Amino acid sequence: MSYYAFEGLIPVVHPTAFVHPSAVLIGDVIVGAGVYIGPLASLRGDYGRLIVQAGANIQDGCIMHGYCDTDTIVGENGHIGHGAILHGCVIGRDALVGMNSVIMDGAVIGEESIVAAISFVKAGFRGEKRQLLMGTPARAVRNVSDDELHWKRLNTKEYQDLVGRCHASLHETQPLRQMEENRPRLQGTTDVTPKR
């Protein structure tokens, strides 16, 4: 793992969290219980404080940063998709930020809300509970349905289960030279296939 102290502040990581060895945590970063931090994520607490609350996930290639005297927060069971950028914002409890979305300074995403992939949430945006946000700039298009929230929660549970699976079996290795016969497939713990 790449952990760096900065001006006397050392990242805090709960022992039940999983932080991928290629992720980087710098300075004023607080990671809660059961959190998943994916490969190549960068949590740079060299200006403001970064808080990832219990059960949340920060996926591959995400960036968290913020200005001085600000907190960038991902609430409990928050779900931050691959490549998303969070800068000085607050992501509410049980909310999802889609892949490659950008959430700017002072923005607040309401709890149980979903930000669609590749959306841009402007600085100072104030969301409400259970909104579906999309676009550039993002706007609320409707409420999140019960089915969508259920799907989001199943996906978040997959990442919560992945924490234990990674602690139990993830390790560095050398590649095989060819695919073995009858190669098994990995199985998730729940069916999260999107319904069409």
UniProtKB/Swiss-Prot annotation:
Regions of compositional bias (Polar residues) in chain numbering: 187-196
Official protein name in the record: Carnitine operon protein CaiE
InterPro entries: CaiE, Hexapep, Transf_Hexapept/Carb_Anhydrase, Trimer_LpxA-like_sf
Statement: the UniProt record of this protein carries the keyword 4Fe-4S: no
NCBIfam families (UniProt xref): PRK13627.1 (NF010150)
Family: Belongs to the transferase hexapeptide repeat family.
Gene3D superfamilies for this protein: Hexapeptide repeat proteins
SUPFAM superfamilies recorded: Trimeric LpxA-like enzymes (SSF51161)
Organism of derivation: Escherichia coli O7:K1 (strain IAI39 / ExPEC)
Residue ranges, annotated region (Disordered): 173-196
Keyword Nucleotide-binding: no
GO terms, biological process: carnitine metabolic process
Function per UniProt: Overproduction of CaiE stimulates the activity of CaiB and CaiD.
Keyword line: Repeat, Transferase
Gene Ontology molecular functions: transferase activity
Pathway in which the depicted protein is active: Amine and polyamine metabolism; carnitine metabolism
